[in-house]
Amino acid sequence: MWIQVRTMDGRDTRRIDSLSKLTKVEDLRARIQQIFGVALESQRLFYRGKQMENGHTLFDYSVGLNDIVQLLVRQIPDSVPTKDKECGISDADSGCGSGQGESDKNSSCGEGATDVDGQPAGINSENVGPSLYKKNDLVDARDLNMGAWFEAQIVSVSKRVNPDGMSAEILDTSAASDDIIYHVKYEDYPENGVVQLTYKDVRLRARTTLPWHDLKVGQVVMVNYNPDEPKERGYWYDAEILRKRETRTIKEIYVKVLLGDAGDSLNDCRIRFVDEIYKIEEPGSAYITTESPQKRQNGPECKHCKDNPKRACRMCACYVCGGKQDPEKQLLCDECDMAFHIYCLKPPLSAIPQDEDWYCPDCRNDASEVVLAGEKLKESKKKAKMASASSSSQRDWGKGMACVGRSRECTIVPSNHYGPIPGVPVGTLWKFRVQVSESGVHRPHVAGIHGRSNDGSYSLVLAGGYEDDVDNGSEFTYTGSGGRDLSGNKRTAEQSCDQKLTNMNRALALNCSAPINDKEGAVAKDWRAGKPVRVVRNTKGKKHSKYAPEDGNRYDGIYKVVKYWPEKGKSGFLVWRYLLRRDDEEPAPWSKEGKERIKKLGLVMQYPDGYLESLASKEREKENKTEDELSESPSKGKRKRNSAGSGLSDAKSTPKKTKVESYKLSLDQKTLIKQDDLNAKLWREVMSFLKEGPKFLSKVEETFLCICCQEVVYEPITTECHHNICKGCLDRSFKALVHNCPACRHDLGKNYSLNVNKPLQAILSQLFPGYERGR
């Protein structure tokens, strides 16, 4: 097998050949050193987000054929300092740890450091001098994140100290100064603690409601507004009145909501609570005593229960029971922010844990399953059960193409699809069985029959077979599976017991248009009424059949089971035999018509990505090795020299590009394409690929791929921005309150109607018959 190694910046990509699934990571590093020239200790290898460590194999990391492994070159410092600089970056800072170290928590070099008494650094609480507000004054304080004003109380007042250590003097005692710091505490949010604000974000608490006739256009007032849900009660913002309108029944007022000093605003917002508009108090007005104020009404914190204390709510209270009692016994998950009573957990906790972070059972990650950077992989239970894990054989089984695994999967039709695969004509050739699996024609890598014992058989492969199998091309006898000891990791063995009509043998028998009979077999009265079976012939069948391909695997079309019966084979054991007969409209690939059609369609051998390059690289290595051996050995005679023009002639003699037969659309299909007006531009581009033959279907699949599920759209919704998405995918997006096009983020709106594009659905069903099954 071979893989691609790419540098982390993406500038250099090299292919590494002659690898195995059992290749050690340290051996891979040695190969990378030869090709990239990077020292072993400077290499960091990553595959699918995991850092590859020595001692493991490519199989342990599930590295597949032609997969990409990323190479990060580690920078090794010339000299390691003996002592870290003060406030320097430690080794833990460059690692992948998730927690904060004790040294970081106690460091005084970071931002927001505090003194011993808890007072922020650079703040002097002595000799503050005159200020606008005093301790215990009731004020409105602005939240710097959202720009809304909340009721608060001043806890203390302090003075900022200049960097030179001298206190800033207040020149005008009546004017506000940036050097005065107000320590305030929000009344409704004590959990936020004490917040430091300047005079711009603190003012006297609003207490005067303005009547309707006193509201003037251009006046700045305090209003209640909810930016997310304008029809609901929200928080208190400064706003400039834009216009007002009064009729006999309603009063309307539109404002520009001001969101802080940065200049951000929300224009043309309608205020619903016109009777609760407050005047902004000027500095120097009469102070409010602690006994007097009437609290303003804010929007509910919880949209589900509207802050009703008698109503159980799993959103704002305990996520298990919904109860709002015992708030001191509730734990808040640091991941999902849901609350849990300690006695509602399973198992319950006796006390609040002392850990800094706590995660609920749904969010908690098992520390034993987490693989940190630099750690070895955990043992896989699945791989531990494999025969290769307990085998004592030293044979390198990881070089075969049957072990590389699929690099892609056929999703155009489900795995239990009967009949042809759309876009795969009769006569298609593949070099390896794994490619046949990727195309969807025959999904198992090794097994000869693909099916289900309660449904039927979908495909089979004619490979080595049995000695007494008869292949007449359009009709052949096939011997069932089983009766062999394939324990361990064996692929084949001699017949050692009788076969039974179970598992895949029964699946193939179900394709016969006759009642199942596991004693004597059955014969179909109308063999064409049976279920279709896709048949692939392998080159290994050449020892028994002249119809097998010269190389690789070939798709030979649809066959039907005529009859099946038990009999004793040459081995002396009972085997089940099946007679299959061809029933396909496309000509057989060995016939004259079939050969002409293969030529017209331009069907040639298909190789895995990178296979030909790997093969050419091996040939060059052999040639170089041979030349080195010849140059080192003493010459006894003249060696024939290659002509100077031979290499050029080989390069010029490229095969002629054969003309491919165009893909033909039926009259009904052309009519449906014309009816699909919404996708007229896409169809014009797709129709230009008709002359490419089978590639036309690949272009259709690529063009009408749903961006959500990455499959051909089913029940397509063609949006107003001309993107095609499955109705189910778009419906799930709308249920998640995301009303944008998944492709371009165009706003579709909450009331967007999901109308299926019926002409597009009809043409896709004709081009890809059966693709809607399982969707």
Curated annotation (Swiss-Prot):
Pathway field: Protein modification; protein ubiquitination
Keyword terms, alphabetized: Cell cycle, Chromatin regulator, DNA-binding, Metal-binding, Nucleus, Repeat, Repressor, Transcription, Transcription regulation, Transferase, Ubl conjugation pathway, Zinc, Zinc-finger
A GO molecular-function descriptor: hemi-methylated DNA-binding
UniProt xrefs under Pfam families: PHD, SAD_SRA, TTD, ubiquitin
Renumbered residue ranges of the record's region Required to promote base flipping: 445-446
Region annotation Required for formation of a 5-methylcytosine-binding pocket: where it falls in the sequence: 466-469, 478-481
Domain Ubiquitin-like: 1-77
ZnF endpoints (PHD-type): 299-366
Biological process according to GO: heterochromatin formation; negative regulation of gene expression via chromosomal CpG island methylation; negative regulation of transcription by RNA polymerase II; protein ubiquitination; ubiquitin-dependent protein catabolic process
Site (Required to discriminate between hemimethylated DNA versus symmetrically methylated DNA): N489
Chain residues that bind DNA: A463, G464, D469
Entry's Gene Ontology cellular component terms: chromatin; euchromatin; heterochromatin; nucleus; replication fork
Family annotation (SUPFAM superfamilies): FYVE/PHD zinc finger (SSF57903), PUA domain-like (SSF88697), RING/U-box (SSF57850), Ubiquitin-like (SSF54236)
Annotated site, Histone H3R2me0 binding, chain positions: P327, Q330
Compartments reported by the entry: Nucleus
Region feature (Linker): 293-301
Sequence segments annotated as region (Disordered): 81-128, 616-655
Region Histone H3R2me0 binding: start-end pairs: 333-337, 353-355
Domain of life: Eukaryota
The UniProt record lists the keyword Transcription: yes
Residues in RING-type zinc fingers: 706-745
EC number(s) recorded for this UniProt protein: 2.3.2.27
Free-text note on domains in this protein's UniProt record: The tudor-like regions specifically recognize and bind histone H3 unmethylated at 'Arg-2' (H3R2me0), while the PHD-type zinc finger specifically recognizes and binds histone H3 trimethylated at 'Lys-9' (H3K9me3).
Function as written in the Swiss-Prot or TrEMBL entry: Multidomain protein that acts as a key epigenetic regulator by bridging DNA methylation and chromatin modification. Specifically recognizes and binds hemimethylated DNA at replication forks via its YDG domain and recruits dnmt1 methyltransferase to ensure faithful propagation of the DNA methylation patterns through DNA replication.
Protein name: E3 ubiquitin-protein ligase UHRF1
Phylogenetic placement of the source organism: Eukaryota, Metazoa, Chordata, Craniata, Vertebrata
Name of encoding gene: uhrf1
